Amino acid sequence: MILSVIHIFLYFVPVLLAVAFLTLTERKVIGYVQLRKGPNVVGPYGLLQPIADGVKLFIKEPIKPSSSNPSVFFFAPMLALILALLLWMPVPLMDAFIELNFAVLFVLAISSLSVYSIMASGWSSNSKYALLGALRAVAQMVSYEVSLGLIILSLICLVGGFNLAQFFSAQEEVMLMLSCWPLGIMWFISTVAETNRSPFDLTEGESELVSGFNVEYSGGPFALFFLAEYANILFMNVLSALLFLAAHFSLLGVAVKVGLLAGLYLWFRASYPRFRYDQLMHLAWKSFLPLSLGLLMLNFSLPLTFSGIGGGL
């Protein structure tokens, strides 16, 4: 029992530390883009800033709106963080926490459940801003999960299995990002939209919704939402590296490729304005859905066609 707890602790603490320093990196990058230093006071070069932010948030009193549903209100951020950490369990970086033959389907299933934590937080806050932000987030995540699912199905047709280890062996000769670059580009843009990041951060339209679905949260519950969001960002980058960039040869290779993808996320946030909501939906349903569906049909029919030709010969 004690060893199991230690195993869980050792598996998830590096994820939370990576999340903490991703926030510091983001603030530094945005600072330099805006020709300023960013955090540089707490600790050497500002390295202790994430710890100071976390301590400040967790020692603050969590304020409950008088008209909210308290049980759902405080359960939603815990659910968000639990689901974000569950996503990491089948990832074989050093040693997977659980070995799953259907790891890709597990990832899709858990990522789709995160919609419920956002919906619960928006509804239980009993605030119009929070509810509108939650509705936007749910619509956006459901829309882009369709294209993510179709892209993964296309890759499964090419690789021939649902296990992440099979993606490693399939990329020994050439990365899937080179052979399937349209799928790779659509996948990356869809992951940005799935994690509600700029330029697809319609859920946090500050000029319209103040802060979106988490507008009524403060202190520890807000920090849990924050940790869940950045854990999802890191996980999507790790998954992108595993699926498309053949990031399985060394932990250093994984770290470098994930760092480059995270840098693209931060570059997008510093550079691009927010999409209009109708443009966001048109991109999902009128561009990505037909294209990913067509590529799925192509990738599904080609092996059948060539196997039929081989059998005839």
UniProtKB/Swiss-Prot annotation:
Keywords: Electron transport, Membrane, Mitochondrion, Mitochondrion inner membrane, NAD, Respiratory chain, Translocase, Transmembrane, Transmembrane helix, Transport, Ubiquinone. It catalyses: a ubiquinone + NADH + 5 H(+)(in) = a ubiquinol + NAD(+) + 4 H(+)(out). The keyword Transmembrane applies. Its EC number is 7.1.1.2. GO terms for cellular component: mitochondrial inner membrane; respiratory chain complex I. It is a multi-pass membrane protein. It is found in: Mitochondrion inner membrane. Pfam families: NADHdh. PROSITE patterns: COMPLEX1_ND1_1 (PS00667), COMPLEX1_ND1_2 (PS00668). GO terms for molecular function: NADH dehydrogenase (ubiquinone) activity. This is NADH-ubiquinone oxidoreductase chain 1. It comes from Branchiostoma floridae.
